[in-house]
A protein has these predicted regions:
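Conserved N-terminal subdomain of the carbohydrate kinase-like
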Residues: 1-89, 272-280
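Short, hinge-like loop/turn segments at secondary-structure boundaries
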Residues: 13-16, 40-43, 132-137, 172-174, ...
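Acidic, amphipathic alpha-helical patches
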Residues: 72-75, 144, 211
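Conserved beta-alpha-beta core of the PfkB/ribokinase-like small-molecule kinase fold
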Residues: 84-174, 182, 190-191
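Conserved phosphate-binding/catalytic region of the ribokinase-like
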Residues: 106-110, 166-280
């Protein structure tokens, strides 16, 4: 993040949420990226651009491999206690940040940390990048698709599956990738299709008429899914997988019932209580 007011506010919030900041990088020559989000009458969000910056790039475009290398012993210690390394694909729009995430993949592999990728296709980030604005859409898709070969777990939306794989079958998507990852495909309020641990299925997720803001719903879904994967160790049958997906769906829904991508994120306990109420 940039050493600006937004960066400072995030640090305050991270501290309040007890987020480990050991590897947080602050840069004086770039800005914290502030995303402009608009909503329609149904609460569905779309990204309309970014707040103007006085710098030539945003801080997330210059995530430094060298700074992480200086903390390599701390990183190894952290990875010894880590089950999943989670990333999106936006970092690939900058070669500097891309180099860093590939370095982290190397370290994760050494310590058997699994990689979770949320495809999270956001073309506006590429369009506004001084590094990649001139790269064609086809080339962007190719770069991201190659990146997905590092995934042990892949989460993507239905429209992303169509764009990157030309179909929405999670089993076939898994078979097209190097590590044959577990694949979860979301589709808004519609059922989730998945291929997990050699099993394939479709799971209904809870819906509501009171949707306020869908910003952050995908992140909450993935956070809920990962927390359940950790609690199970690894789901071994269809019932356990469906439980993971339903809990993830609850987390996504709860985030949609109020404004904002952070404030509405539910706790594990809140998600569990909500799911129990639905079942009963």
């Amino acid at each position: 993040m940039g050493s600006d007011d937004y960066g400072k506010r995030f640090i305050t919030q991270f501290n309040e949420l007890d987020v480990n900041l050991d590897f947080l990088q602050l840069d004086n020559d770039s800005s914290t990226r502030v995303v402009n989000v608009d909503r329609d009458q149904f609460g569905d969000r779309f990204f309309s651009g970014f707040e103007e910056s006085s710098h030539s790039c945003f801080a997330d475009e210059i995530l430094s491999k060298k700074l992480i290398e200086k903390e390599i012993l701390n990183l190894e210690k952290t990875f010894l206690e880590t089950k999943y390394l989670v990333t999106g694909t936006i970092l690939l729009s900058s070669p500097i940040s891309a180099e860093t995430i590939f370095f982290l993949f190397e370290q994760a592999k050494k310590l058997e940390v699994k990689v979770v990728i949320d495809l999270n296709w956001r073309e506006v980030f590429w369009d506004h990048s001084s590094f990649s604005s001139k790269i064609s859409k086809d080339q962007r898709v190719k770069i991201i698709k190659n990146f997905l070969n590092h995934a042990h777990v892949l989460k993507l939306a239905k429209e992303e599956a169509t764009l990157f794989f030309e179909h929405e079958n999670p089993l076939l998507i898994s078979q097209q990738l190097l590590k044959q990852p577990d694949v979860i495909i979301t589709d808004g309020k519609n059922p989730v299709s998945w291929y997990f641990n050699g099993l394939q299925g479709i799971t209904e997720t809870p819906t509501s008429q009171k949707i306020v803001d869908t910003t952050g719903a995908g992140d909450a879904f993935l956070a809920g899914l990962i927390s359940k994967l950790i609690s199970y160790g690894y789901p071994s049958n269809k019932l356990e997988i469906e439980d993971c997906v339903k809990f993830a769906g609850v987390c996504g829904l709860l985030t949609c019932l109020g404004e904002g991508a952070i404030e509405q994120q539910p706790s594990y306990e809140k998600g569990t209580r909500f799911l129990e109420c639905l079942i009963s």
